UniProtKB/Swiss-Prot annotation:
UniProt pathway annotation: Cofactor biosynthesis; adenosylcobalamin biosynthesis; cob(II)yrinate a,c-diamide from sirohydrochlorin (anaerobic route): step 6/10
Catalytic function, reaction form: Co-precorrin-5B + S-adenosyl-L-methionine = Co-precorrin-6A + S-adenosyl-L-homocysteine
Gene source species: Clostridium perfringens (strain ATCC 13124 / DSM 756 / JCM 1290 / NCIMB 6125 / NCTC 8237 / Type A)
Protein name: Cobalt-precorrin-5B C(1)-methyltransferase
Alphabetized Pfam families for the sequence: CbiD
Keywords: Cobalamin biosynthesis, Methyltransferase, S-adenosyl-L-methionine, Transferase
EC number: 2.1.1.195
GO biological process: anaerobic cobalamin biosynthetic process; methylation
Top-level enzyme category: transferase
Lineage: Bacteria, Bacillati, Bacillota, Clostridia, Eubacteriales
Family listed: Belongs to the CbiD family.
Length: 365
């Protein structure tokens, strides 16, 4: 059992590890056993959080030219549909290089606009890099290997996830931006947000809110160094209230259009189960701007806001400005005019291109 805990709200909560970590560990173990001709029971991997995991290897299967094994997903106290699921990797020797494939129970992306290209297995960018890094660390220099990730119960479990709504078929996604699962109970998460805001407010007169790791990466990659970033998950309204309670009057919110656009409709909890109006916001603005209804329908047919942005291309800067201005207006109303707000809105997971920055923003000055 993974022995890492966080404390929140007076409760001790156990962390877990992602399907991405499981896939990377299984792939590394299978590769090691294939080329060293011996079984092992535990494998160590690193994670993007620089936390090392020592994971127990299960169900080793040796064939003529390949070896496969599994790692059991442990979600800690954040038990979701994939917790307890076996994530397998099969390693086969090839002439040279590294290849990564998706097998049984790993979903296939069928729509544009996700973080993985259409037709590819639903193995997200960070897990892909983790798998490659760990495999290459044990692959002999003069050898090549093909890794196939497969999840025997993946097709069944995927029905309990959001994959069907996203156009990901026939299995689960291999996910995780940090490699670690932190307990996400609402009470615990809100308390941790409140504590971080209070801590950051001690030495800062302004705060920057991001929804998750991607938002923070967006800032750091552009040279932002101040220690005033708070990850607020989906709790925009709650976080604003906490900041105001600490006397913070200047707030910048940095986020993907899929999150920020919801605020334009007055949604201050941006979780998809609470508010899912991303496409409607874009469609409404296009309609108000006088664009053809055929284009509006195409936007509404997309699975994600990412897909809508890619469909529209780079010819709609006024659209994002209008959405941004409505977000700012909603924020001002929510805070009763007691704070100054700025926003930075982007799209993409790798390129993370800026769509809109409010006029008074000075994060990079």
């Amino acid at each position: 059992m993974f022995d890492m805990y966080i404390e929140s709200g007076g409760k001790k909560l156990r962390c877990g590890y992602t399907t991405g970590s499981c896939a990377a560990a299984a792939a590394k173990a299978a590769t090691y056993m294939l080329f060293n001709k011996k079984d092992i029971s535990v494998i160590e991997i690193d994670t993007p959080k620089n936390i090392k995991l020592n994971l127990e290897i299960q169900d080793i299967q040796v064939e003529k030219n390949s070896i496969s094994c599994s790692i059991v997903k442990d979600g800690g106290d954040d038990i979701d549909a994939t917790s307890g699921l076996e994530i397998f990797a099969k390693a086969e020797e090839i002439e040279e290089g590294f290849e990564l494939c998706g097998g049984e129970g790993v979903g296939v992306v069928t729509k544009e606009g996700l973080f993985v290209e259409k037709g590819q297995p639903a193995i997200n960018p960070v897990p892909r890099e983790m798998i490659k890094k760990e495999v290459l660390s044990v692959l002999p220099k003069d050898k090549g290997v093909r890794i196939t990730i497969f999840v025997p119960r993946g097709r069944e479990i995927a029905k309990k996830t959001f994959n069907p709504r996203l156009g990901i078929v026939d299995g689960i996604s291999i996910l995780g931006t940090t490699g670690i699962v932190y307990p996400m109970s609402e009470e615990a998460l809100k308390e941790s947000i409140r504590i971080e805001i209070r801590q950051k407010a001690v030495n800062n007169k302004d705060l920057v809110f991001v929804f998750g790791n991607m938002g923070e990466r967006f800032l750091r990659e552009r040279g932002y160094k101040k220690d005033n970033i708070v990850v607020i998950s989906n709790y925009v309204g709650f976080s604003i209230e906490c900041a105001l309670a600490q006397g913070i009057k200047d707030l910048t919110i940095v986020g993907h259009i899929g999150k920020l656009s919801k605020i334009a409709f007055g949604c201050f909890n941006t979780h998809s189960r609470v508010s899912d109006v991303r496409l409607e916001v874009i469609a409404l603005e296009l309609t108000l701007m006088g664009y053809d209804l055929e284009l509006v329908k195409k936007v509404l047919d997309q699975k994600t806001s990412e897909g809508a942005v890619r469909l529209l291309g780079e010819d709609f800067p006024m659209l994002y400005e209008r959405i941004g201005e409505k977000v700012l207006k909603r924020l001002d109303i929510y805070a009763y005019g007691e704070a100054n707000f700025n926003i930075l809105m982007y799209y993409g997971s790798k390129e993370m291109k800026l769509l809109y920055e409010s006029k008074n923003s000075n994060l990079f000055d």
